[in-house]
């Protein structure tokens, strides 16, 4: 056994019919951990249902259906391996909550793979004002996904097939858009592929012999290795809290920064509840320490399940413990709000795993979203396309941090009317000190 490969997380984005599922399914199918028996079962069902286009999207549809029905799928199904990396696809696109998950979830995407439908009409629909291609790319950039790979998909269905001219037209247009968003298009590989036929996915395609760049697999291998923030203080937003017979209370979540280990005394924000960590587990194995990116369950002593909730944040009681935010100042970009947003607006904020209404207490300035320069002080309102600095007050206790210190806890989506109306990053937080927070016996002993 050589050195274990680095794990990286990938978010697949693009317009609704661009072929995200087929492309992702194809990678997982060819390079992934899907059990051959499962594939055979899917193939048989596909044949019975006469789904010629089965191949790969079907695999993903099955996985998604099982996931949505709450059947926990072995998450290995969403993994695949390149020469250099273990890759996890952190969201299956086309999912209702995709945008929300992107915001709460992309915190840990190391690279976005943007899938473009290269067919006549398909590309134009995706990149149009209403298309999702733009929104997804903007979101990915705002939320700190610095690396991108662009796949010009469905090259087998361009006119003429595998058209170099069409590819070049798309590269030109998408590059200019990505540049506006903030990416450097010279650093973004544009790979012409067919997710269905498999051209340039893994092996080079003779159909595209005019293209000299990397295949999708090679482009994934060229991703810069991410630096994991294990030297920062612990921040672990809770996704769920379970009561497990014979063990007790087990909060579950992903370590975003720092490390968590047995024997550590943790403080949960926003309440300040403090207790000792008895054990830490990942995939049913005990760990001596968990690092950023690890999804773990950990057992805490003398704590009732009702004292912890999704959205609470575990932190090291001795190293910058998490606290409730009294208010915070954010830079927001209004993405799709039908009217105008003024002081007093109270939408829901999705930040890490919390989902809480906040009040836009004061619009401080309106700024140019490209340069960050101030355009207007104390504007009356912000509308679509505007960016501004806003002071916000949570309506319930919540933990947020500045984007500069703890990026995953410093970015958010503003949701209203069942859609993402804005995204933002947090510039400053005024914190409250907890009063009368419970400190368990186990924690006192450790002091």
UniProtKB/Swiss-Prot annotation:
Region annotated G4, chain positions: 153-156
PROSITE patterns from the UniProt entry: G_TR_1 (PS00301), G_TR_2 (PS51722)
Chain segments carrying region G1: 14-21
Residues with the N6,N6-dimethyllysine modification: 55
Primary site of residence: cytoplasm
Gene3D superfamilies in the record: P-loop containing nucleotide triphosphate hydrolases, Translation factors
Region (G5), start-end ranges: 194-196
Residues where GTP binds: 14-21, 91-95, 153-156
Location of region: G2: 70-74
NCBIfam families: EF-1_alpha, PRK12317.1
The protein's name: Elongation factor 1-alpha
Organism field: Triticum aestivum
Phylogenetic classification of the source organism: Eukaryota, Viridiplantae, Streptophyta, Embryophyta, Tracheophyta
Gene symbol of the encoding locus: TEF1
């Amino acid at each position: 056994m050589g050195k274990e490969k680095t794990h990286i997380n990938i978010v697949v984005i693009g317009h609704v019919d661009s072929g995200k599922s087929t492309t992702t399914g194809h990678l997982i199918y060819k390079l992934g951990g899907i059990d051959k028996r499962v594939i055979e079962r899917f193939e048989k069902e596909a044949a019975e249902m006469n789904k010629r286009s089965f191949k790969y999207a079907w695999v993903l549809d099955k996985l998604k259906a099982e996931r949505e029905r709450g059947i926990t799928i072995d998450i290995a199904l969403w993994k695949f391996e390149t020469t250099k990396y273990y890759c996890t696809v952190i969201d299956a696109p086309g999912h209702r909550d995709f945008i929300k998950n992107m915001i709460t979830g992309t915190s840990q995407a190391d690279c976005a793979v943007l899938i473009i439908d290269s067919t006549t009409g398909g590309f134009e629909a995706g990149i149009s004002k209403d298309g999702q291609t733009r929104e997804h790319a903007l979101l990915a950039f705002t939320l700190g996904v610095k690396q991108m790979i662009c796949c010009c998909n469905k090259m087998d269905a361009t006119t003429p097939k595998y058209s170099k001219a069409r590819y070049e037209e798309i590269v030109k247009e998408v590059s200019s858009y990505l540049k506006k968003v903030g990416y450097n298009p010279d650093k973004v590989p544009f790979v012409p592929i067919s997710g269905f036929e498999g051209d340039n996915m893994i092996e080079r395609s003779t159909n595209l012999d005019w293209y000299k760049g990397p295949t999708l697999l090679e482009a994934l291998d060229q991703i810069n290795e991410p630096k994991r923030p294990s030297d920062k203080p612990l921040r672990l937003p809770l996704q769920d809290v379970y009561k497990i017979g014979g063990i007790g209370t087990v909060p579950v979540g992903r370590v975003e920064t720092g490390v968590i280990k047995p024997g550590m005394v943790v403080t949960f924000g926003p309440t300040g509840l403090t207790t000792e960590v008895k054990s830490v587990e990942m995939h049913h194995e005990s760990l001596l320490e968990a690092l950023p990116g690890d999804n773990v369950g950990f057992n805490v002593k003398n704590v009732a399940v009702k004292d912890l909730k999704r959205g609470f944040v575990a932190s090291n009681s001795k190293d910058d413990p998490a606290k409730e935010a009294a208010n915070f100042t954010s830079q927001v970009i209004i993405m799709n709000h039908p009217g105008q947003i003024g002081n007093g607006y109270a939408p829901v904020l999705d930040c890490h795993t919390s989902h809480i209404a906040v009040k836009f207490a004061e619009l401080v300035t309106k700024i140019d979203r490209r340069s960050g320069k101030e355009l207007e002080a104390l504007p009356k309102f912000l509308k679509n396309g505007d960016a501004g600095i806003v002071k916000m007050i949570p309506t319930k206790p919540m933990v947020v941090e500045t984007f500069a210190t703890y990026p995953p806890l410093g970015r958010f989506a503003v949701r209203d009317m069942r859609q993402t109306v804005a995204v933002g990053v947090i510039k400053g937080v005024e914190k409250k000190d907890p009063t009368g927070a419970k400190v368990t016996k186990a924690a006192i002993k450790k002091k």
